[in-house]
């Protein structure tokens, strides 16, 4: 099995690149809002514990399946030890199945991400982003409070790509990932 982490800042294009990568491989996409949105809808608020538990069930069952692999998108704060621990936790679920891991970090400046924050695809797939003012404010606050871009050389993983995707189409990025990692 193959497991592709697509990491990066808010609205950098993780889900969209993941959608395109899924189209050209046998990988299945599990973008982070696939658990966030139902929890918000059902509970009327964000509930991190429930979201984590839902992800755990999906990861455990998928790892034990006969599927080719998974793409998982995750907004990672590289300055938070708990984020690194979470990546390791997810890996531990899949490691007993001989999974190969790949890591893609997408990078784009804030102005590009603010423009992408209101894209049709994003708003269609992430209802919680439809209050654009709140969503933009959250993005700006996250930029102030967290470092969601790695430093050069900081990421210790094998099979790691760092892609500045400001001026690249999602299809182009997905094709590059597929070719580079032989997915």
Residue ranges of each PLM-predicted region?
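Hydrophobic anchor at the beta1->P-loop junction of P-loop NTPases
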Residues: 6
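Conserved substrate/cofactor phosphate-moiety recognition/catalytic segment
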Residues: 19-63
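P-loop (Walker A) phosphate-binding loop of NTP-binding proteins
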Residues: 9
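Glycine-rich phosphate-binding loop used to anchor ATP phosphates in small-molecule kinases
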Residues: 50-105
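Walker A/P-loop
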Residues: 15
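ATP-binding Walker
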Residues: 12
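Small-molecule kinase domains that catalyze NTP-dependent phosphoryl transfer to phosphate-bearing small molecules
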Residues: 123-173
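Conserved phosphate-donor/acceptor-positioning beta-strand/loop module used by diverse small-molecule
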Residues: 95-117, 163
